[in-house]
UniProtKB/Swiss-Prot annotation:
Residues 251-339 are annotated as: Alpha C-terminal domain (alpha-CTD). SMART domains: RPOLD (SM00662). Residues 1-235 are annotated as: Alpha N-terminal domain (alpha-NTD). InterPro entries: DNA-dir_RNA_pol_insert (IPR011262), DNA-dir_RNA_pol_RpoA/D/Rpb3 (IPR011263), DNA-dir_RpoA (IPR011773), RBP11-like (IPR036603), RNAP_asu_C (IPR011260), RNApol_insert_sf (IPR036643). One of its GO terms (molecular function) is protein dimerization activity. It catalyses: RNA(n) + a ribonucleoside 5'-triphosphate = RNA(n+1) + diphosphate. Pfam families: RNA_pol_A_bac (PF01000), RNA_pol_A_CTD (PF03118), RNA_pol_L (PF01193). This is DNA-directed RNA polymerase subunit alpha. The gene is rpoA. Belongs to the RNA polymerase alpha chain family. Keywords: DNA-directed RNA polymerase, Nucleotidyltransferase, Transcription, Transferase. It comes from the Bacteria. GO terms for biological process: DNA-templated transcription.
């Protein structure tokens, strides 16, 4: 159907190229190419917004500190004010295996640092940055805290984390639920065959360790896919099963691919076209000497073609029995549809 060409004939990335950062569990760079012109920005901006705002995570939503009535207090023997302690608590990275609120406790006597790793273990909760410093205790000082951990998405300000029946001394905390801490993207021009105006999308993202960068990107894409589904007001007709390639072909069906689909330089592609070399099967039967006798075809173009063919397990000067087949155009079309 003609209408299906709206989406079926658009260029799509073959696969994602993922490069891990210094901390593979937290940092990665993902490249998607080629994309139709303009799609790099469309997809990059959408994914970035969803990654930062819409993924589920866990965070501390409130804290109670023994002997403290409000966040503008100070604690004897503790070097940091309660305001600074709350700011540190806000950055505790948490992985939760439950969507139910949980409580964690911390109790420590000085002197020394109080870190997130000092928080008592809870079965469904994992602290991902145990070295995070919460406060510093002087000799003989003691501190006891109780934290509430909840799950959610995005950013929720402290005032929304105060329950109506909050006890005296409960201090609400800004909840940074998103497991994604940083996202950036850039769009560059790339090449697809002879087209030089395609997009290359590069996304660099960092998480707090609750989810891997690759999984975070996959979840964001799934969210976008699910949100867009409501706009599709039709069902696609079932794709007819493609006719199988003739089993009696005496040669590799990849030879039916046209040479203009190879990523060759403009000079090399034009030389092949001028020499009436249409299919890879035509090309590989040529010897190096024959190719070099082609007008405007030099050693640089020869080396380029040899390298491309080598990547396909082919080379110049091959003998191809049964080439060319009588119905080559029909077979080439069937090959294109099949693969």
């Amino acid at each position: 159907m003609v209408i299906q060409k709206n989406w079926q004939e658009l260029i799509k990335p073959n696969k994602l190229q993922v490069t891990a950062g210094d901390d593979p569990k937290r940092v990665a760079t993902v490249v998607a190419e080629p994309l139709e012109r303009g799609f790099g920005t469309t997809l990059g901006n959408s994914l970035r917004r969803v990654l930062l705002s819409s993924l589920q995570g866990a965070a501390v939503t409130s804290v109670q500190i023994d002997g403290v009535l409000h966040e503008f207090s100070s604690i004897p023997g503790v070097r940091e004010d309660v305001t600074d302690i709350v700011l540190n608590i806000k950055t505790i990275a948490i992985r939760s295996q439950t969507d139910q609120p949980k409580r964690m406790t911390l109790r420590k006597t000085g002197p020394g640092l109080v870190t997130a790793g000092d928080i008592g273990a809870v079965g469904d909760i994992q602290i991902l940055n145990p070295d995070l410093v919460i406060c510093t205790l002087d000799d003989g000082a003691e501190i006891r805290m109780e934290f509430t951990v909840a799950t959610g998405k995005g950013y929720v300000p402290a005032e929304r984390n105060r329950p109506e029946d909050a006890p005296i001394g409960l201090i609400p905390v800004d909840a940074l639920y998103s497991p994604v801490t940083k996202v950036s993207y850039r769009v560059e021009t790339t090449r697809e065959g002879q087209d030089l105006d395609k997009d290359k999308l590069t996304i660099t993202l960092e998480t707090n360790g609750a989810v891997s960068p690759e999984d975070a990107l996959a979840y964001a894409a799934r969210i976008i896919q699910d949100q867009l589904q409501v706009f599709v007001n039709f069902e696609e007709p079932r794709k007819e099963e493609a006719a199988p390639l003739a089993p009696q072909l005496p040669f590799n069906p990849a030879l039916l691919k046209k040479v203009d689909e190879l990523e060759l330089s403009v000079r090399s592609a034009n030389c092949l076209k001028n020499d009436n070399i249409v299919y890879i099967g035509d090309l590989i039967q040529k010897s190096e000497g024959e190719m070099l006798r082609t007008p405007n075809f030099g050693r640089k173009s020869l080396n380029e073609i040899k390298e491309v063919l080598a990547g396909m397990g082919l080379h110049l000067g091959m003998d191809v029995p049964g080439w060319p087949p009588e119905n080559i155009e029909d077979l080439a079309k069937r090959f294109e549809e099949h693969y």
